[in-house]
């Protein structure tokens, strides 16, 4: 049976799941029996240290047709669009914005379509992130990929994806996200003729739900809305290619079978998807615009309490009702660095120039905020009426470390050289009181 005919999901975030595509494949009461049912092999996939605290420990046991060790020797793939070289050269403090990444003119699958924009940290140190775009027009048929450097957060903007993994099938569409754990093998099939989107490669602590604090027990992204696939497998032999991302480079090896041959598995280290339209948005119902941390969907913790390695936040449809308040996002300089993208519609802080598929980067202490047209409109708005922002889905990868743009991003033809001009219309309107006014 093809894998896509086995697509179904289990619900919950970080749950201890157990699933089998063939009845009787999961051992009862133990992980590694002397002989696994149906002639399968037992293999553990560890996403954290064995000794990580129980509440943070992530691992799954896989029962598969062949162990993951069965493949040929790896050789380096010479390519230049995907890398983790963020260490050299000065980083300009400019605000930056890019138009959408052009779609490919020749056959390009997901792996070949990856394009690194910026990053910080390193896979060696297991801290930081890399931000990539992807643009593809072909499915991965006899090719499989895994990333040993970090987990992958996929944000589709154009076109639907079917992500066939060792642990089951994720189908994603724009306004949904998918997370692929570090090390998990998968292939990406296009369900439409073209696909484009964003990828955050997280080298640091595994993504988790943010603490809710005074919000209470419910709100933001609710755990029940996350979906993890049930076991699904394929048994194919032939000439296939296994591509690995390891220490910032791509490597390839021959493999004589499909590695998506896990018949059953149990554990809490698994891929998942989430529909951003289910996010329970929190906002002010009195005055002022709260800090954007209230829009956090997932967070990767750092070694500093209260400071994330990376936060993934969204700006979804919502009502703005704050009184005597400038309702759009305010002008800001931030110790953190912000990479933004737009999946759908219009972003409420930018009247023009920020298109779906585009991106912006506001690094540490770079001033940013609404453009002149948005400021003028919001400053004169009738606050007796709510602003209903109904047609939007923007997002942000916010990192504690500076995001160092790659040379290809700095020199890209789709970089908007005149981005700073969106603030040029913000004129000085200060009128100090006269002596008569003071009296």
From Swiss-Prot:
Homogentisate binds at residues 347, 368. It comes from Xanthomonas euvesicatoria pv. vesicatoria (strain 85-10) (Xanthomonas campestris pv. vesicatoria). One of its GO terms (biological process) is L-phenylalanine catabolic process. One of its GO terms (molecular function) is iron ion binding. Hexamer; dimer of trimers. It catalyses: homogentisate + O2 = 4-maleylacetoacetate + H(+). One of its GO terms (cellular component) is cytoplasm. Its EC number is 1.13.11.5. Keywords: Dioxygenase, Iron, Metal-binding, Oxidoreductase, Phenylalanine catabolism, Tyrosine catabolism. InterPro entries: HgmA_C, HgmA_N, Homogentis_dOase, Homogentis_dOase_bac, RmlC-like_jellyroll, RmlC_Cupin_sf. Fe cation binds at residues 332, 338, 368. This is Homogentisate 1,2-dioxygenase. Its cofactor is Fe cation. PANTHER family: HOMOGENTISATE 1,2-DIOXYGENASE (PTHR11056:SF0). The keyword Oxidoreductase applies. It holds the Pfam family HgmA_N. Involved in the catabolism of homogentisate (2,5-dihydroxyphenylacetate or 2,5-OH-PhAc), a central intermediate in the degradation of phenylalanine and tyrosine. Catalyzes the oxidative ring cleavage of the aromatic ring of homogentisate to yield maleylacetoacetate.
């Amino acid at each position: 049976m093809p894998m896509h005919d086995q697509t179904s999901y289990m619900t919950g975030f970080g749950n201890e799941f157990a699933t089998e595509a063939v009845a009787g494949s999961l051992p009862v009461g133990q992980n590694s029996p002397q002989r696994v049912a149906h002639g399968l092999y037992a293999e553990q996939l560890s996403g954290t240290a064995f000794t990580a605290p129980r509440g943070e420990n992530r691992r799954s046991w896989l029962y598969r047709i062949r162990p993951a060790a069965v493949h040929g020797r790896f050789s380096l793939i010479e390519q230049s669009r995907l890398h983790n070289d963020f260490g050299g050269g000065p980083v300009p403090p400019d605000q930056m914005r890019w138009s959408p990444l052009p779609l490919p003119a020749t056959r390009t699958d997901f792996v070949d379509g990856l394009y690194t924009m910026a990053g910080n940290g390193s896979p060696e140190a297991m801290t930081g992130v890399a931000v990539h775009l992807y643009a593809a027009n072909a499915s991965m048929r006899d090719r499989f990929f895994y990333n040993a450097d970090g987990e992958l957060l996929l944000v589709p903007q154009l076109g639907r994806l079917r992500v066939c993994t060792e642990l089951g099938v994720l189908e994603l569409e724009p306004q949904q996200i998918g997370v692929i754990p570090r090390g998990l093998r998968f292939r990406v099939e296009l369900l439409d003729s073209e696909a484009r989107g964003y990828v955050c490669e997280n080298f640091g602590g595994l993504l988790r739900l943010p603490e809710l604090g005074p919000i209470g027990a419910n709100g933001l992204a609710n755990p029940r809305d996350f979906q993890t696939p049930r076991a699904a497998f394929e048994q194919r032999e032939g000439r296939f290619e296994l591509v690995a991302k390891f220490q910032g480079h791509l490597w390839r090896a021959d493999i004589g079978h499909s590695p998506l041959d896990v018949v059953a598995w149990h554990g809490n280290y698994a891929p998942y998807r989430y529909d951003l339209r289910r996010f329970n948005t929190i906002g002010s119902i009195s005055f002022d615009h709260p800090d954007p941390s209230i829009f956090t969907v997932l967070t990767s913790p750092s070694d500093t309490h209260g400071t994330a390695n990376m936060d993934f936040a969204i700006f979804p449809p919502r009502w703005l009702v704050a009184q005597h308040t400038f309702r759009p996002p305010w002008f800001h300089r931030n110790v953190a660095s912000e990479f933004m993208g737009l999946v759908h519609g219009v972003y409420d802080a930018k009247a023009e120039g920020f298109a779906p598929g585009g991106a912006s980067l506001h690094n540490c202490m770079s001033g940013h905020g609404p453009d002149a047209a948005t400021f003028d409109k919001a400053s004169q708005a009738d606050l007796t009426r709510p602003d209903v922002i109904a047609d939007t889905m923007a997002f942000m990868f916010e990192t504690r470390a500076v995001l160092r743009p790659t040379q290809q991003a700095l020199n890209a033809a789709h970089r908007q050289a005149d981005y700073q001009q969106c603030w040029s219309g913000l004129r000085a309107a200060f009128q100090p009181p006269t002596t008569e006014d003071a009296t």
